[in-house]
Swiss-Prot record:
Subunit details: Interacts with TRAF1, TRAF2, TRAF3 and TRAF5.
Topology feature Cytoplasmic, residues: 407-595
Disulphide-bridged cysteine pairs: 29-44, 45-58, 48-65, 69-81, 84-98, 87-106, 108-122, 131-149, 233-240, 244-256, 259-273, 262-281, 283-297, 289-300
Record organism: Homo sapiens (Human)
Reported function: Receptor for TNFSF8/CD30L. May play a role in the regulation of cellular growth and transformation of activated lymphoblasts. Regulates gene expression through activation of NF-kappa-B.
GO cellular component terms, A-Z: cytoplasm; extracellular exosome; nucleoplasm; plasma membrane
Record note on modification: Phosphorylated on serine and tyrosine residues. Isoform 2 is constitutively phosphorylated.
Keywords of the record: Cell membrane, Cytoplasm, Disulfide bond, Glycoprotein, Membrane, Phosphoprotein, Receptor, Repeat, Signal, Transmembrane, Transmembrane helix
Gene responsible for this protein: TNFRSF8
Region ranges (Disordered): 167-238, 323-355, 438-457, 485-509, 536-595
Family recorded in the similarity comment: Belongs to the TNFR8 family.
Skewed-composition ranges (Basic and acidic residues): 499-509
Protein name (database record): Tumor necrosis factor receptor superfamily member 8
Length: 595
């Protein structure tokens, strides 16, 4: 029993963990149009109005949104877009690129200093002065200050650029404030480009920062003279390099160049400033570089807000001088639909890119048979089991109901068609009734004498044809009553429209021949005769009087035999067929006694 309770408890905990835990926070954001739910940070974020750009990934208040300025413009403290200064003059170089919240900073090019400063630039630049004879350089010239000279010490060689570099006395030379030329043999070893490797440059810089007054280095040549600045400077030697001020480095042209600054809030230092390489800056974590600059980034923007199924594509920024254009207003960078573990930083080295690729290739595939959802971190999360159960149940109910309604509709349609076929059968074309009697009218003497002179053709034409098909009882009776009876007119004279054909008077049940057969159904056959009753005391032998003709006309309706069995319900349209015997001769009417 305890094992069963423990298993039920584990199942309950698994069901609780399968459901998303941040749904209450997500529901609170839906009702507020000024906020939206960020699945990456799992909290509500402020939606910046149109024309403003968020300064962080999930802004919380209107102050976290800033105005979007055009390129080469920055947003000043008064929240206005101001143009950045230009460094288009020949004596100016760019020190700090133009950013979204700071202007571009220009300074005098190497070998010159600024005599008249301006805001973020210099109005007038002059060349560094040269120390006169007997003077050596105390402080080399910078972009802001001129060269400072001092009298040479007795034990210092005037060929060296600084008294800290050389201690050997020499004479007959004039101190100069210009950089010492570097020999080609040592230039490749002393001046190392940044692209070759940052680690080697840092190691070289650490070797060159030894104290110049160290007893182990004074007067002792180094094994690698090109990388050792502490060796003595012999007379006329060109192995001594120029010593730059702090925050300056010696470029490939042998000039001291200012290192870039990472003082902005959205930048961090990636590589420090060395004697032969500049400082390298990159965007802080959570931001990407939209506009790059030399050894830095001009504009950093937050990571785009992607859906739960997508993550941000890592951008390959291993090369420094690669130029990236800013995305248009209102758009976000691309999102990769393929989930990856973690987000790549804004700038990665080739070694880190290879490691990321190897880790991505070793990721195990996720089976697609089970319902899987991707969280903001890219890890698969199984959906709740009851959701799949309810979906299958709803599908089964819908399919079953549709099949039942379809079958029921077909059955009802079949029944309705059967009822319509019984009540409204297909009407067959009935032949036109042509009642023509060519027999001459019989005289009263012939009727009295009982002479029977008849013709078969006249008897066949003198009778009215009965309808071949009757639908309902009322329809058949009305149709028979509507048929007019015509009597044969004597030869040579026109027949009156009110002349009636002579009815056939049969003997009282002496004729056993079948005159007509009424077929009601396939299993019901009724045999009977048609009777024409005459008034008592009257015969057909007398003269045709008007009263007799009216009585015969009024009483000419034939009487059909009644059906003995009651028809079933719904058989109102039973078909009755009248079949007459062929070749049957009508018996002659008997003579009526005259009064």
């Amino acid at each position: 029993m305890r094992v069963l309770l423990a298993a039920l408890g584990l199942l309950f905990l698994g069901a609780l963990r399968a459901f998303p835990q941040d749904r209450p926070f997500e529901d609170t954001c839906h009702g507020n149009p000024s906020h939206y739910y960020d699945k990456a940070v799992r909290r509500c974020c402020y939606r910046c109005p149109m024309g403003l750009f968020p300064t962080q990934q999930c802004p919380q208040r209107p102050t976290d949104c800033r105005k979007q300025c055009e390129p080469d413009y920055y947003l000043d403290e008064a929240d206005r877009c101001t143009a950045c200064v230009t460094c288009s003059r020949d004596d100016l170089v760019e020190k700090t690129p133009c950013a979204w919240n700071s202007s571009r900073v220009c300074e005098c090019r190497p070998g010159m200093f600024c005599s008249t400063s301006a805001v973020n630039s210099c109005a007038r630049c002059f060349f560094h002065s040269v120390c006169p004879a007997g003077m050596i350089v105390k402080f080399p010239g910078t972009a802001q200050k001129n060269t400072v000279c001092e009298p040479a010490s007795p034990g210092v060689s005037p060929a060296c650029a600084s008294p800290e570099n050389c201690k050997e006395p020499s004479s007959g030379t004039i101190p100069q404030a210009k950089p010492t030329p570097v020999s080609p043999a040592t230039s490749s070893a002393s001046t190392m480009p940044v692209r070759g490797g940052t680690r080697l440059a840092q190691e070289a810089a650490s070797k060159l920062t030894r104290a110049p007054d160290s007893p182990s280095s004074v007067g002792r040549p180094s094994s690698d003279p090109g990388l050792s600045p502490t060796q003595p400077c012999p007379e006329g030697s060109g192995d001594c390099r120029k010593q730059c001020e702090p925050d300056y480095y010696l470029d490939e042209a042998g000039r001291c160049t200012a290192c870039v600054s990472c003082s902005r809030d959205d930048l961090v230092e990636k590589t420090p400033c060395a004697w032969n390489s500049s400082r390298t800056c990159e965007c802080r974590p959570g931001m990407i570089c939209a506009t790059s600059a030399t050894n830095s980034c001009a504009r950093c923007v937050p990571y785009p807000i992607c859906a739960a199924e997508t993550v941000t594509k890592p951008q390959d920024m291993a090369e420094k001088d690669t130029t990236f254009e800013a995305p248009p207003l209102g758009t976000q960078p691309d999102c990769n639909p393929t989930p990856e573990n973690g987000e790549a930083p804004a700038s990665t080295s080739p070694t880190q890119s290879l490691l990321v690729d190897s880790q991505a290739s070793k990721t195990l595939p996720i089976p697609t048979s089970a319902p899987v959802a991707l969280s903001s971190t890219g890890k698969p999360v199984l959906d709740a089991g009851p959701v799949l159960f309810w979906v299958i149940l709803v599908l089964v109910v819908v399919v079953g109901s549709s099949a039942f309604l379809l079958c029921h509709r077909r059955a009802c349609r079949k029944r309705i068609r059967q009822k319509l076929h019984l009540c409204y059968p297909v009407q067959t074309s009935q032949p036109k009734l042509e009642l023509v009697d060519s027999r001459p009218r019989r005289s009263s003497t012939q009727l009295r004498s009982g002479a029977s002179v008849t013709e078969p053709v006249a008897e066949e034409r003198g009778l009215m044809s009965q309808p071949l098909m009757e639908t309902c009882h009322s329809v058949g009776a009305a149709y028979l009553e509507s048929l007019p009876l015509q009597d044969a007119s004597p030869a040579g004279g026109p027949s009156s429209p009110r002349d009636l054909p002579e009815p056939r008077v049969s003997t009282e049940h002496t004729n056993n021949k079948i005159e007509k057969i009424y077929i009601m159904k396939a299993d019901t056959v009724i045999v009977g005769t048609v009777k024409a009753e005459l008034p008592e005391g009257r015969g057909l032998a007398g003269p045709a009087e008007p009263e007799l003709e009216e009585e015969l006309e009024a009483d000419h309706t034939p009487h059909y035999p009644e059906q003995e069995t009651e028809p079933p319900l719904g058989s109102c349209s039973d078909v009755m067929l009248s079949v007459e015997e062929e070749g049957k001769e009508d018996p002659l009417p008997t003579a009526a006694s005259g009064k």
